[in-house]
């Protein structure tokens, strides 16, 4: 399967995790990042999550991706 989007998450300070998202034209990462309180553009977007663990943040990201895919049909 071809990779259509990538997400990178990392701790940027003690209480903050940043997620950066990039995609090809088929996946609107802006909509996914908006579900986590962020934003951006169709193919480039980001968000910052405070006071969560990396695992909790990745779980929320996976939920947001699943919601996006369900909404797309």
Where are these regions (language model features)?
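Gly/His-enriched, cation/cofactor- and phosphate-binding structural elements
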Residues: 1-73
